[in-house]
Structure formats: C-alpha cells, structure tokens
Amino acid sequence: SLHDALPIYDPHSYTNIVDCQNTQKRTLLPFWIWQEKSSEVYRLLEKYDNDEEQNQFVYFNLPLFSDQLPLCHCVITASCIEITPFGTDISKIKSFQSGSRRIFMSATLSDDSVFVTALGLKPESISSIITPESANDIGDRLILFPKHLNHNLTDEIIREKITQLAGQYNVVVIVPSGERAKFWDPTGSRTVTKENIKNAVSTMKERLVGLRVFVNRYDGIDLPGDACRMLVLDGLPPLHTEYEKYVQSIDASSSILLREQVQRIEQGMGRGVRSNSDSCCVVLMGDQLSDVLLRNQGVSYFSKATMVQFGLS
C-alpha cells in the first residue's frame, strides 16, 4: 500500500504529513511506486466510489480516468490524496468526439498549445485561429500599481483612499481568501458569498452600493458600467490543485504555473469592463502579485491588448 511505500522512499515527508499532520506539507509519489500500486488504488477507488453527498470519497468521474490511472500524478497531503491526470481522455466523451463542428472560444488565452495537449486538436488546426484585427472591442482600463510607483505607500493608505472613492462609485475588491477579506471588511457585512452573490451583483447593477468584497471570484461575474467603476485585485489568485502547489514549492518560477496565474489575474481584471464602451480603473495590490507580474516577468503573459493598457497606464 502507499502507507508502506512512502516512509521507505521519503521518511521525512511521511513524518511531516502522516505523523505530524502538517497541513503545509505535501509530497509527490514517485512514478515507479505509483505505477506499481495503481491497480490496488483503482480497486479502492472502485469500492468507495459513490454519489452520497455526505459520504463521498471519489470526487471525479472514475470511468473517465480509469485507463490513465498509471500515468497520473499522485500528491499526498495531511488531508487528502489527490490524483491528477495529464489531461482528459476526450475520446470517452462521445458527444464531443463525434461532434461534426467544434468551436473553442477564449478571451484571455495566452497559450494556445492547450488545444493540442488537452483537447486533442491537430497542430495545424491552431495555425488558423480566428482573431480580431484590432482590439477596439475592448473597453478602457486604467491599470494602477500604487506600490510599484511609490514604495512608501502601505496597504492601509491604499485601502483608505479606495474606501473614500467607494462613496462615489461602486468598487469591487477581489481577494484570494476569506482571511484577506477581513482586511477590507472586518465585520463581513460587505463581503459577497455564494449565498448572496446573485442579489449582490443585481443590486450593484441597479444603484450605488459602495464597496463590495468578492472572495476568489476571478471569473463568472459580469459588472458592466456603473456596477463597477473601480476594481481592486488584492493578492495573488490561489493555485487550484495540490499538484500545482507542489510544483510551486520546488520551482517557484515555473512558467506553466506563472502563465496560469497571470491568466486568472487577467480574467479578474476583466470583471469590470464588459464592452468597448465600458471603462474601469483597475488597482493591483499585494507583494505576491507584484512578484509574479514584475519580478517574474508575468506581465509578458498578458494578452496583447492588456499589455498595451498596462504599459500606457
């Protein structure tokens, strides 16, 4: 079992994760151990796979990945075992595989190789991507990075000024965690949750509500016009998976993770500008976000239109 193999391969990780239950530690199981144990793992997954909401063990469609299991990554943490495939076997999705026409659309795709690696397109297909000749369908964004311009500015000073502006305009603050949300909204009265997000967005489109805080909402919300005249991105969008966190722990400058994080930042920046006649001020904050965009040259992964707006600002 994995329980027997891990302490032999990496006793320090075993101690940190299993014995000490350190939630900050994670380890990637070596591929030779994973391949040796994958059949045994599959039997366990098959045994405990169910749809019971209160007692769910497997959180993905097992038949979709069963053939790929020996080739997956396996990351072990104190709270979970995460199995990550290299990609989805789209041949098993019959409606997709047999479709006579497939249309792929993206507003912020900085790496089109994903069409080949994840969706199975032929390389020659991406040589004829349809793109607009100009960026005149994109609204106006003034992109500000206050601490990059003046190192003496503190988060508290920036917050005070933005809070003042929220008396005149609707201001949206997107933060990566509930803990950071407390910096902007200690009482929680202005923090939008999944329970009230629909009403909150609807109200912002109708009238002035001031400042609202959204936690980890970098896509899926549209705030055109006066619904959002100032958008604050405070902090770096969190990584999705334990595998991504593991990669970051051993290679903080990974170009793959950097590209994905910058794409999420750009998605967040687009929440307040929804048409070519729209306008919004975007404020970027946070030391980690600054490191990604400036020290690690993450700005180079912006789309061309956003890169131009960033440069002009």
Summary of predicted features, one role per range:
Residues S1-Y169, G178-W184, G311-S313:
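Conserved coupling segment at the C-terminus of the helicase ATP-binding
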Residues T84, M105-A107, I174-S177, K194, ...:
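Short His-Asn-centered micro-motif
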Residues H148-L149, T203-V292:
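Conserved RecA-like P-loop NTPase helicase motor core
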